[in-house]
Amino acid sequence: MPGHPGAAEQLVKTGWRSWHLGFWKALAPLQAAWDAFSQPVPASCGQLLTQLLLCASLAAAAAGLVYHWLASLLLYPPGPSAMVATVCGLLVFLSLGLVPPVRCLFALSVPTLGMEQGRRLLLSYSTATLAIAVVPNVLANVGAAGQVLRCVTEGSLESLLNTTHQLHAASRALGPTGQAGSRGLTFEAQDNGSAFYLHMLRVTQQVLEDFSGLESLARAAALGTQRVVTGLFMLGLLVESAWYLHCYLTDLRFDNIYATQQLTQRLAQAQATHLLAPPPTWLLQAAQLRLSQEELLSCLLRLGLLALLLVATAVAVATDHVAFLLAQATVDWAQKLPTVPITLTVKYDVAYTVLGFIPFLFNQLAPESPFLSVHSSYQWELRLTSARCPLLPARRPRAAAPLAAGALQLLAGSTVLLEAYARRLRHAIAASFFTAQEARRVRHLHARLQRRHDRHQGQQLPLGDPSCVPTPRPACKPPAWIDYRLDALRTESSEGEGKELWSCRDLSCNLGPVPPPCVTLGKSLHLSEPRFLHLHNDSIFTIDVTYFPRRDVVRMEGNTGHDRPG
């Protein structure tokens, strides 16, 4: 049906209008709360209650964040952490409620988090989190591999000593019988085998203790570094916010590059909207979401540096996983080492013959008479790992810490893109707290735009040939670029006193009659300009200007200091 598309479009427009109206209605209480918060002195009891409620909420939130930061992240004891958080909350409430610049400073610290100082804080916290999680884990896995080496060494030494002991026992079991005949069995075991075993045990134990101490030292160093760096960056955050507020209040040129609504209204009232046609490149639209080319280029460069940090984080995480896999493979190999059973059987038979040569003469075997028969069996196990040496399991990498570090780095990367908006928000916050200062800054920006427009207009004037029509009159009029407002400075002087205000001289000696002055470039001079602020109403001011258009000299002389007649 033909009516359906129009009805659907009308329905969409109505829905969009309703959503937009509802959105602004929802923002109205927030705007009222912000107006009350940014007022130096509340105008009503409602604003006072709103201001106190906001200050109390911010103080409670600050106390909770401080406690979580101290107790959970920096691992301080709960008791001192709660005490410090309570004191911080009380100080924040009193400062916000009684000192308006502190409220502005507190509000400025929020967009400052989205700038370079906040990015440093996020990156330092990310690095510390990654170091606390990865470095001890890598050292623990190296320690597990070292424990495998210790257990294998200890087990091999035990097996060697046990084998030596069994062989020594077998040689002793033979006793004096081993000395029968001309041959004997001699087996000698050194008595310092236990000392060697203890020495190797101490060496391996020392290596493991060194690894354990290194792991504890790395954990403590990372935690201490995180505490110090976080504290320094938080202090730097407050200092940077205070520096911005100081420069905003003392320097009219500082961060005064935004085309705000106040500037637009002032230009409209002064009928000077042409000053923004076209706007200068350095002037940023405060309410516009589009970034300038300079801002985009700066964002790309900083994102490149953050990409290098992400690569370093990925390398650290990969190192952690490789160390875990190697330690796990080593521990599994040690656990699967077989136990080798060894059985030593000693069989010793002694027999004798009497007149054995007689049967030998008849090519017969001599009968043997058994004299001694010894049968001994010795069994033990050859273990490559010691039963008294427990194997340490490989420590699996924690996924939460690298993910948190990566999230913080991505958040820091987002602050690169949001830094331009954070600067605009910071300017808007300071302007809402100090409206009189913002009005002075708007007037200064208006004057700057006016000067830029005047320079631009002066550069656009043509510099062609002067058009002079010779006329035989003895005097010449003032140049056209002298503003008509200088007529008020002219004075009728008495005869013989002073000089004529305007005089023209033809110094080229070849043009015949004196032409009128020809000016191709100039500007109007106003008494409101800074170079004329020293003049008083009781003085006559004349201008002495020399201009040379193509060797034709026009000279205008001026006198000052003559009293006004009457």
From Swiss-Prot:
Residues 73-81, 150-227, 326-398 are extracellular. One of its GO terms (cellular component) is membrane. It is a multi-pass membrane protein. One of its GO terms (biological process) is cellular response to tumor necrosis factor. It is found in: Membrane. Residues 1-51, 103-128, 249-304, 420-566 are cytoplasmic. It holds the Pfam family DC_STAMP. This is Osteoclast stimulatory transmembrane protein. It comes from Homo sapiens (Human). The gene is OCSTAMP.
